[in-house]
Amino acid sequence: MIKTEEDFKNGQVLLIDKPLNWTSFQVVNKLRWEIRQRFNIKKIKVGHAGTLDPLASGLLIICTGKQTKEIHIYQGQEKEYTGSFTLGATTPSYDLETEIDNAFPTAHITETLLKETTQQFLGNIQQKPPIFSAIKKDGKRLYELARKGETTEINARTVRISEFEITKINLPIIEFRVVCSKGTYIRSLAYDFGLALNSGAHLSALRRTKIGNFCVDKADSIENFIESLHLDSKKSETTP
């Protein structure tokens, strides 16, 4: 179905499969620019309903026009992630953005221990966000302070984990699936999971597969969205 300028202004909900090494902000900017170019308009509202780190891929909900007023609804929905933790080592950012800073034993870790430990994280838990995060404190992003080497106290927050399962074990790497509430940091889950194992861990891969009832397998790549947008342009020019 051909989408018009009015369709985008009245509001569209776009499902985009964010690639690795893109920020969520870059995806929003790219789509906004393409929509503006397609319809030769100066301004249109475009926003996302929940950020993904550059080192994560998967589902982004992008809202346009009047639909941006509903972003908070999508932000509040449960999210599903799959990915991997690397056991036996930690990093300051809790993922691959920074180098390993400490190594820990893993010889005692068994499949039984792994699966028993997941149970500690189900339900409402207290979680501290990573120091390398976009959360603001005293007007500054935490990652700005972290990159300057400044230390700061971070308060724990209540988050909810509905499901947490280990899907594959190939030590030191384990694969997982998590269903969690808004505000949950999977990087922090990796770090805390490592501590609970009397070891260490960091997030080595992450993909968001669901937000509420929206699934990543229904999402477009950025390239496919742009192609269909301009294909609509050609169709509309040839339609009598």
Residue spans of the language-model regions?
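Catalytic/RNA-binding core of pseudouridine synthases
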Residues: M1-P240
